[in-house]
Amino acid sequence: MSLLAVGTVAFDAIETPFGKTDKIVGGAATYICLSASYFTKKINLVSVVGEDFPRESIKMLQDHGVNTNGLQIKMGEKTFFWSGKYHNDMNSRDTLDTQLNVLESFDPVIPEAYQDCEFLMLGNLVPAVQSKVIMSLKNRPK
Protein backbone atom coordinates (compact mmCIF):
# COMPACT_ATOMS: atom_id res chain seq x y z
CA MET A 1 0.00 0.00 0.00
CA SER A 2 1.26 3.49 -0.82
CA LEU A 3 -0.07 6.78 0.54
CA LEU A 4 0.28 10.34 -0.68
CA ALA A 5 -0.51 12.94 1.99
CA VAL A 6 -0.98 16.55 0.93
CA GLY A 7 -1.72 19.07 3.64
CA THR A 8 -0.26 21.22 6.36
CA VAL A 9 2.98 20.77 8.23
CA ALA A 10 2.74 23.48 10.84
CA PHE A 11 3.34 24.91 14.27
CA ASP A 12 0.53 24.77 16.83
CA ALA A 13 -0.02 26.36 20.22
CA ILE A 14 -2.71 24.48 22.10
CA GLU A 15 -4.41 25.19 25.40
CA THR A 16 -6.65 22.66 27.13
CA PRO A 17 -8.10 22.47 30.64
CA PHE A 18 -5.22 20.07 31.35
CA GLY A 19 -2.22 21.93 29.97
CA LYS A 20 -0.76 24.35 27.48
CA THR A 21 1.89 24.28 24.75
CA ASP A 22 3.47 27.31 23.19
CA LYS A 23 4.86 26.02 19.89
CA ILE A 24 4.77 22.39 18.85
CA VAL A 25 4.90 20.63 15.51
CA GLY A 26 1.40 20.22 14.14
CA GLY A 27 -0.49 20.08 10.89
CA ALA A 28 -2.82 17.59 9.27
CA ALA A 29 -0.21 16.11 6.92
CA THR A 30 2.25 15.65 9.76
CA TYR A 31 -0.12 13.47 11.73
CA ILE A 32 -1.56 11.71 8.68
CA CYS A 33 1.98 10.58 7.82
CA LEU A 34 2.96 9.64 11.36
CA SER A 35 -0.23 7.63 11.86
CA ALA A 36 0.11 5.89 8.50
CA SER A 37 3.69 4.91 9.30
CA TYR A 38 2.33 2.23 11.63
CA PHE A 39 0.43 0.57 8.77
CA THR A 40 2.45 1.06 5.59
CA LYS A 41 6.01 1.69 4.55
CA LYS A 42 5.43 3.85 1.45
CA ILE A 43 4.33 7.29 2.62
CA ASN A 44 4.90 10.38 0.48
CA LEU A 45 4.43 13.91 1.79
CA VAL A 46 3.65 17.09 -0.13
CA SER A 47 3.56 20.27 1.94
CA VAL A 48 5.34 23.55 2.58
CA VAL A 49 7.20 25.01 5.56
CA GLY A 50 9.24 28.12 6.21
CA GLU A 51 12.92 28.29 7.03
CA ASP A 52 11.96 28.41 10.73
CA PHE A 53 10.79 24.78 10.67
CA PRO A 54 13.23 22.57 12.61
CA ARG A 55 15.32 20.17 10.54
CA GLU A 56 15.08 17.66 13.40
CA SER A 57 11.29 17.55 12.89
CA ILE A 58 11.81 16.74 9.20
CA LYS A 59 14.25 14.03 10.26
CA MET A 60 11.63 12.67 12.68
CA LEU A 61 9.23 12.25 9.75
CA GLN A 62 11.95 10.57 7.71
CA ASP A 63 12.77 8.26 10.63
CA HIS A 64 9.13 7.13 10.49
CA GLY A 65 9.58 6.21 6.83
CA VAL A 66 8.03 9.35 5.34
CA ASN A 67 9.45 10.47 1.99
CA THR A 68 9.84 14.24 2.38
CA ASN A 69 11.09 14.98 -1.15
CA GLY A 70 7.78 16.79 -1.75
CA LEU A 71 8.22 19.08 1.26
CA GLN A 72 8.95 22.60 0.03
CA ILE A 73 11.09 24.77 2.33
CA LYS A 74 10.60 28.48 1.65
CA MET A 75 13.69 30.39 2.73
CA GLY A 76 13.06 33.78 4.32
CA GLU A 77 9.47 32.82 5.16
CA LYS A 78 7.59 31.46 8.17
CA THR A 79 5.73 28.20 8.67
CA PHE A 80 1.92 28.10 9.01
CA PHE A 81 0.87 28.66 12.65
CA TRP A 82 -2.41 27.88 14.43
CA SER A 83 -3.36 28.48 18.04
CA GLY A 84 -6.48 27.22 19.77
CA LYS A 85 -8.12 26.73 23.14
CA TYR A 86 -10.09 23.55 23.78
CA HIS A 87 -13.02 23.54 26.18
CA ASN A 88 -13.74 21.10 29.02
CA ASP A 89 -15.46 18.62 26.70
CA MET A 90 -12.27 18.53 24.54
CA ASN A 91 -14.61 18.45 21.53
CA SER A 92 -15.22 22.16 21.08
CA ARG A 93 -12.56 24.81 20.72
CA ASP A 94 -11.89 28.40 19.84
CA THR A 95 -9.28 29.46 17.33
CA LEU A 96 -7.12 32.12 18.92
CA ASP A 97 -4.72 32.83 16.06
CA THR A 98 -4.11 31.72 12.48
CA GLN A 99 -1.04 32.85 10.55
CA LEU A 100 -1.09 31.41 7.03
CA ASN A 101 2.47 32.46 6.21
CA VAL A 102 3.86 30.02 3.55
CA LEU A 103 0.49 28.28 3.26
CA GLU A 104 -1.06 31.40 1.72
CA SER A 105 0.81 30.87 -1.55
CA PHE A 106 1.20 27.07 -1.37
CA ASP A 107 1.20 25.53 -4.82
CA PRO A 108 1.60 21.77 -4.38
CA VAL A 109 3.99 20.07 -6.76
CA ILE A 110 3.56 16.31 -6.96
CA PRO A 111 6.94 14.68 -7.70
CA GLU A 112 7.00 12.11 -10.47
CA ALA A 113 7.98 9.42 -7.95
CA TYR A 114 4.71 10.04 -6.06
CA GLN A 115 2.48 9.49 -9.10
CA ASP A 116 1.94 5.79 -8.38
CA CYS A 117 0.18 6.34 -5.05
CA GLU A 118 -2.57 3.90 -4.21
CA PHE A 119 -4.25 6.16 -1.64
CA LEU A 120 -4.50 9.96 -1.42
CA MET A 121 -5.22 11.79 1.82
CA LEU A 122 -5.90 15.51 1.52
CA GLY A 123 -5.52 17.65 4.62
CA ASN A 124 -7.37 20.85 5.41
CA LEU A 125 -6.49 22.87 2.33
CA VAL A 126 -8.75 25.14 0.30
CA PRO A 127 -10.86 23.17 -2.23
CA ALA A 128 -9.11 24.74 -5.25
CA VAL A 129 -5.76 23.42 -4.02
CA GLN A 130 -7.24 20.00 -3.26
CA SER A 131 -8.75 19.87 -6.75
CA LYS A 132 -5.43 20.85 -8.33
CA VAL A 133 -3.72 17.97 -6.52
CA ILE A 134 -6.31 15.45 -7.72
CA MET A 135 -6.12 16.73 -11.30
CA SER A 136 -2.30 16.60 -11.32
CA LEU A 137 -2.22 12.86 -10.57
CA LYS A 138 -1.87 10.57 -13.57
CA ASN A 139 -3.91 7.79 -11.95
CA ARG A 140 -6.90 8.34 -9.72
CA PRO A 141 -6.07 6.97 -6.24
CA LYS A 142 -8.55 5.71 -3.67
Protein language model regions, located:
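Extreme N-terminal starter segment of soluble prokaryotic enzymes
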Residues: 1-4
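Active-site metal-binding loops of divalent metal-dependent hydrolases
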Residues: 8-9
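Conserved N-terminal subdomain of the carbohydrate kinase-like
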Residues: 12-23, 40-122, 136-139
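Short catalytic helix/loop segments, enriched in acidic residues and glycine
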Residues: 19-34
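A short, N-terminal amphipathic alpha-helix
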Residues: 30-44
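Short, well-ordered alpha-helical microsegments
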Residues: 54-55, 128-131
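Short, structured patches in soluble enzyme cores that scaffold and shape functional sites
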Residues: 124-126
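ADP-ribose/adenylate-binding Rossmann-like module
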Residues: 142
